[in-house]
């Protein structure tokens, strides 16, 4: 049995879950999300908990069991608490500003870089070097954060770039001159 997949998911008060075949629809105070479970996996509601089960012990069924349980749990957490990723910008002249709902970055290029907020994602800027990305869909929040990080990856020699808050980068020593 999958160690993750066998754990039931508690349904908090204020959250409504509908299961229609393989489609799991979750409504909560922050919005509603849905996911389609992969082929061999099924879900059911018992005693105010969501149970994710697999029909057999085939390799594919075992691998999809834990994944499906995590996807459904992400929906429940997303509609109740939401997800937030915080990022920091390091470097002389590197800054971020909020323009309406979008972000404008100055990252040493000859032009400012504009990132538009996808539906369901909100940006918040603290000062000129800290930003946070919030939303109810964990996958979408993480994807937007990855796109922003890719704009200017951390430089291992000077430490400049965009990184997640608290992330430690491995610094390298430069060449020594003669």
Swiss-Prot record:
GO molecular function, one term: structural constituent of ribosome
Keywords: Ribonucleoprotein, Ribosomal protein, RNA-binding, rRNA-binding
UniProt-listed Gene3D superfamilies: Ribosomal protein L6, alpha-beta domain (3.90.930.12)
SUPFAM superfamilies given in the database record: Ribosomal protein L6 (SSF56053)
GO cellular component: cytosolic large ribosomal subunit
GO biological process, one term: cytoplasmic translation
InterPro entries for the chain: Ribosomal_uL6-like, Ribosomal_uL6-like_a/b-dom_sf, Ribosomal_uL6_a/b-dom, Ribosomal_uL6_bac-type
Pfam families: Ribosomal_L6 (PF00347)
HAMAP family the record matches: Ribosomal_uL6_B
NCBIfam families: L6_bact
Assembly behavior: Part of the 50S ribosomal subunit.
Protein family membership: Belongs to the universal ribosomal protein uL6 family.
Its biological purpose: This protein binds to the 23S rRNA, and is important in its secondary structure. It is located near the subunit interface in the base of the L7/L12 stalk, and near the tRNA binding site of the peptidyltransferase center.
Protein name: Large ribosomal subunit protein uL6
Organism of provenance: Corynebacterium efficiens (strain DSM 44549 / YS-314 / AJ 12310 / JCM 11189 / NBRC 100395)
Phylogenetic placement of the source organism: Bacteria, Bacillati, Actinomycetota, Actinomycetes, Mycobacteriales
């Amino acid at each position: 049995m999958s160690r993750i997949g066998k754990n039931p998911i508690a349904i908090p008060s204020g959250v409504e879950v509908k299961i229609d075949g393989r489609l799991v629809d979750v409504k909560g105070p922050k919005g509603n999300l849905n996911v389609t479970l992969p082929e061999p996996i099924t879900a059911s509601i018992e005693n105010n908990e969501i149970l994710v089960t697999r029909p057999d012990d085939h390799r594919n069924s075992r691998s999809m069991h834990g994944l499906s349980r995590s996807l459904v749990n992400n929906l429940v957490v997303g509609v109740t608490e939401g997800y937030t990723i915080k990022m920091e910008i390091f470097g002389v002249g590197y800054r971020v500003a909020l323009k309406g709902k979008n972000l404008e970055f100055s990252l040493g290029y000859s032009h400012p870089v504009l990132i538009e907020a996808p539906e369901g994602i909100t940006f918040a800027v603290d000062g000129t070097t800290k930003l946070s990305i919030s939303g109810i869909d964990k996958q979408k929040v993480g994807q937007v954060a990855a796109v922003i990080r890719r704009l200017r990856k951390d430089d291992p020699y000077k430490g400049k770039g965009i990184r997640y808050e608290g992330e430690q980068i491995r610094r390298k020593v430069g060449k020594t001159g003669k």
